[in-house]
Amino acid sequence: MEVNGEEERRSRREDEEKEDYYYSLLNSPCSVCNKFVQAILKCLGLESSSIPPSSSSSSPSLVEEEDSGTETVEETGFMARITAVLRRRPRPPPYSSGRPGQNN
């Protein structure tokens, strides 16, 4: 008897957690977009744990830091993720002054 009651309570608790989750998704479209972007970045392997999630993406805060004599601007939130992605891209190879292509 107690096992069935415990299973029933656990099932009710799981149902309530699911309802709370879906309720928060439906009432907060910004959180849906944020979770979508986080999922995409995570799938691409570009999510960084050093960048804290922003509470409002409309006004990102800027913090200036000095690293070995150079000034950098660190942004928080969505724009910081985009700039981090852009910074991680490899540089294009330098132009070669070698032999030009051949015309047939």
UniProtKB/Swiss-Prot annotation:
<feature type="propeptide">
    <location>
        <begin position="1"/>
        <end position="81"/>
    </location>
</feature>
<feature type="compositionally biased region" description="Low complexity">
    <location>
        <begin position="48"/>
        <end position="61"/>
    </location>
</feature>
<dbReference type="InterPro" id="IPR035176">
    <property type="entry name" value="PEP"/>
</dbReference>
<feature type="region of interest" description="Disordered">
    <location>
        <begin position="48"/>
        <end position="104"/>
    </location>
</feature>
<dbReference type="GO" id="GO:0045087">
    <property type="term" value="P:innate immune response"/>
</dbReference>
<keyword id="KW-0611">Plant defense</keyword>
<dbReference type="Pfam" id="PF17232">
    <property type="entry name" value="Pep1_7"/>
</dbReference>
<comment type="function">
    <text>Elicitor of plant defense.</text>
</comment>
<feature type="compositionally biased region" description="Acidic residues">
    <location>
        <begin position="63"/>
        <end position="74"/>
    </location>
</feature>
<comment type="similarity">
    <text>Belongs to the brassicaceae elicitor peptide family.</text>
</comment>
<feature type="site" description="Required for ligand-receptor interaction">
    <location>
        <position position="98"/>
    </location>
</feature>
<protein>
    <recommendedName>
        <fullName>Elicitor peptide 6</fullName>
    </recommendedName>
</protein>
